[in-house]
Curated annotation (Swiss-Prot):
One record GO biological process: aerobic respiration
GO molecular function, one term: demethylmenaquinone methyltransferase activity
Functional pathway: Quinol/quinone metabolism; menaquinone biosynthesis; menaquinol from 1,4-dihydroxy-2-naphthoate: step 2/2; Cofactor biosynthesis; ubiquinone biosynthesis
Protein name as it appears in the record: Ubiquinone/menaquinone biosynthesis C-methyltransferase UbiE
Catalyzed reactions per annotation: a 2-demethylmenaquinol + S-adenosyl-L-methionine = a menaquinol + S-adenosyl-L-homocysteine + H(+); a 2-methoxy-6-(all-trans-polyprenyl)benzene-1,4-diol + S-adenosyl-L-methionine = a 5-methoxy-2-methyl-3-(all-trans-polyprenyl)benzene-1,4-diol + S-adenosyl-L-homocysteine + H(+)
Record family assignment: Belongs to the class I-like SAM-binding methyltransferase superfamily. MenG/UbiE family.
Cysteines joined through disulfide linkages: none
Keyword hit for NADP: no
Keywords: Menaquinone biosynthesis, Methyltransferase, S-adenosyl-L-methionine, Transferase, Ubiquinone biosynthesis
Length: 263
């Protein structure tokens, strides 16, 4: 994308690690709190947010993610969905497994988890799910605990992406699968310009109309532009120890689905 700036974290002039909150440079200690505040504000309208960010395509991309994961229908198969508070991915996994899978939904934001719990009860899926409030950088699970690890539109908000990837590798069983769906770099020049106009001008305005909050939506757009390109993120996944790393672009690169295996 024309405003892509690569990885959000970089070494500053004083030798310390700088972090960004959207396009704004912030201290490492500030970032998580700022991100949490955004998601407290948008939790009740999270599906609306994703519809705005993707023009409704996130539903198609998530279905494709689950198809590529191909959850097992054998009893005892387990999956960890990180930053999955409202349950979109976890619900799909449970249904695709014939309601055999057990999915742990982990999110650092209690408001998001609250929405997920309510939705799970309404869908009759609560028995297949566990909700855990914790950080992606410090997963409260033993080594080799899960058959699959998923994260959808969440990893770009983690202050230390490398730590989250290392933790993903740690908690997966040998032979386990890592899948990450995230907004990415548009690779079609014409679509790039159109998407920039939509993202930076339309989304914050519509977000304000629907939720009364334009700033949160501006941050979410900016955070996409700060996220690593497809190839760079694939290299980070490999560095964490994963093998057979690959990715698929959706809608010209507006989103990308990365895959890796713990072998």
């Amino acid at each position: 994308m024309s405003q892509q700036n690569g990885n959000a974290d970089r070494v500053g002039a004083q030798g310390g690690m700088e972090h960004s909150f959207g396009f704004k440079a912030v201290d490492e200690s500030e970032k998580q709190g700022l991100v949490n505040d955004v998601f407290h504000k948008v939790a009740s309208k999270y599906d609306v947010m994703n519809d705005l960010m993707s023009a409704g395509m996130h539903r198609v991309w998530k279905d494709a993610m689950i198809a590529w994961l191909a959850p097992s229908k054998r009893p005892g198969w387990t999956s960890l969905d990180v930053a999955g508070g409202t349950g979109d991915i976890a619900f799909r996994i449970v249904e695709a497994s014939g309601r055999q899978a057990h999915v742990t939904i982990l999110d650092i934001n209690g408001s998001m988890l609250g929405v997920g719990r309510e939705r799970a009860i309404k869908k009759g899926l609560a028995d297949n799910l566990e909700f855990v409030e914790a950080s992606a950088e410090e997963l409260p699970f033993e080594d080799a605990s899960f058959d699959a690890y998923t994260i959808s539109f969440g990893i770009r908000n983690v202050p230390h992406i490398d730590k989250a990837l290392s933790e993903a590798y740690r908690v997966l069983k040998p032979g386990g699968r890592f899948l990450c769906l995230e907004f990415s770099e548009v690779e079609l020049p014409v679509l790039d310009k159109v998407y920039d106009q939509w993202s930076f001008h339309a989304i914050p305005r519509i977000g304000k109309m629907i939720t009364g909050d334009a700033d949160s939506y501006s941050y979410l757009v900016e955070s996409i532009r700060k996220f690593p390109k497809q190839q760079d993120f694939a290299a980070m996944i490999e560095k964490a120890g994963f093998e057979r790393v690959s990715y698929r672009n959706f809608t010209g690169g507006i989103a990308a689905l990365h895959s890796g295996w713990k072998l």
